[in-house]
Curated annotation (Swiss-Prot):
Visual pigments are the light-absorbing molecules that mediate vision. They consist of an apoprotein, opsin, covalently linked to cis-retinal. Residues 334-355 are annotated as: Disordered. It comes from Psalidodon fasciatus. This is Blue-sensitive opsin. It is found in: Membrane. The modification N6-(retinylidene)lysine is found at residue 301. Residues 1-41, 105-118, 182-207, 282-289 are extracellular. PANTHER family: OPSIN. The keyword Ion transport does not apply. GO terms for molecular function: G protein-coupled receptor activity; photoreceptor activity. GO terms for biological process: phototransduction; visual perception. The gene is B23. The keyword Transmembrane applies. Keywords: Chromophore, Disulfide bond, G-protein coupled receptor, Glycoprotein, Membrane, Phosphoprotein, Photoreceptor protein, Receptor, Retinal protein, Sensory transduction, Transducer, Transmembrane, Transmembrane helix, Vision. Belongs to the G-protein coupled receptor 1 family. Opsin subfamily.
Amino acid sequence: MKSRPQEFQEDFYIPIPLDTNNITALSPFLVPQDHLGGSGIFMIMTVFMLFLFIGGTSINVLTIVCTVQYKKLRSHLNYILVNLAISNLLVSTVGSFTAFVSFLNRYFIFGPTACKIEGFVATLGGMVSLWSLSVVAFERWLVICKPVGNFSFKGTHAIIGCALTWFFALLASTPPLFGWSRYIPEGLQCSCGPDWYTTENKYNNESYVMFLFCFCFGFPFTVILFCYGQLLFTLKSAAKAQADSASTQKAEREVTKMVVVMVMGFLVCWLPYASFALWVVFNRGQSFDLRLGTIPSCFSKASTVYNPVIYVFMNKQFRSCMMKLIFCGKSPFGDDEEASSSSQVTQVSSVGPEK
């Protein structure tokens, strides 16, 4: 049966040919989207989103509580990690939970207004998380590489860094609320995000996608690569100068490993969205498998779980305090880990060039 042209809808868009000219009857706000996938794929996504909701909420609440509980964790450089936890919490409690309920029902049961709210909040949280990763890199470059001499990193600088992540995130996430792009159901139509699909219409989605690619992917990724590249260069120079120092050699290996993991974590989270959005812009009008359109959203929401693992659990001092909190004051790793962490942090922080 030949597919018919689709009518344009203000609140949703299904980018595949359908055997009906009454697309309103298949609205993702009204009926289960069984025409897009079998019950198995919806059940898999339901379980996955439930895992992200429980895991993301638990680990980020634990990060915040642990920081409040232990004074030693309330250093200026850790402010941005708490900021990251707050943004992740926003995504997991709003984005992942809403997606879980919707996948369970196989359509977005909350309606078009809630879709716009969920899309905005999840995008805002995701953007804050994204910018937090670049601020983490910038702050470490500032403290370790000392590009401005013996710069003293204070609480004011940390707060400014956190505030900038929210400012940039609002700059990127609010335009769809005012007509530059729009928030609609994406992928299997059970979660909402910016409109990556439609082209050549009043929403100017192509220009918005290019704006996001440059401002929210290209620029932060450049900052991360530059800062971590400089950091590794500084550590390698220090390691050569102190070839007999086992602690310096160990610090270099540990930081190199962490940098690689951090860069890969950023790419895993945001490269699928960036690639998918660009593909849509440069292949206008082509249909695609909606299950593939769901993948970028899955990766970005999954970052609420794996980013804390990278940035918090790979921090030995943070991990030690977290284990003490979980095990009622007794860390199963003992106190040696915390001591070695302090020693290593001191070693790494002092390798920058003198000005």
